[in-house]
Amino acid sequence: MAGKIADVEKVILTASGGPFRDVKDLAEVSLADALNHPTWNMGPVVTINSATLVNKGLEIIEAHYLFDIPYNKIEAVIHPQSVVHSMVEFKDGSTIAQASPPNMKGPIAYAIAHPDRIAQAMPAIDWKSAHAWSFAPIDHERFPAVELAKRCGALGGAVAAMYNAANEVAVAAFMKEEIPFTAIVDTIEKTVTTLGGQAQSVVRDMKDVSAIENDARRVAQEALAKR
């Protein structure tokens, strides 16, 4: 974006779609299925967040705060190859894409060395080889986490923190195989519906955020206990 936020029409984040982008019955998927990511090698919690697309919801919230971009200008699309990681569309119709192999070495090196770049931080894309990149819209009925994150973020206050806290509780339960996969995002939505008004209040400091997070964890655990 080069600091020219006024020229930005939209920011597009990409999601691999996780292991379930083509699976019809998400209620029947197992923990082992969820941990079998097709393109990334990550820890278990992040891998499950990728499967639910909660990770993309969190990235949308992060982009909003890091770059002061309105939520209605941030989108996410499915990109199974995980090579194009984000794009910025400008008001003149042009788009700049950030592309690299699915490897966290590059982003970590860039964060450490910014504004400089570390030589050969990771292998570059071989542009002489044939590549097929595809993009598709997210099916928000099957994967409601992204739109839910945008709604939470738009509500303001600490609702986004509530989204994250409820997710952590639900993912922990799924990893213990206590709940089905589809219950993860259901639990987040129930928590936000129950406490969203409270979390919209003005956040003065980290004590306020911690209190709201604790309330969200409690309500999420209560919702899971009622299943």
Question: Where in this protein do the model-derived segments appear?
Answer:
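Catalytic, metal-anchored helix/loop core of enzyme active sites in primary metabolism
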Residues: 1-227
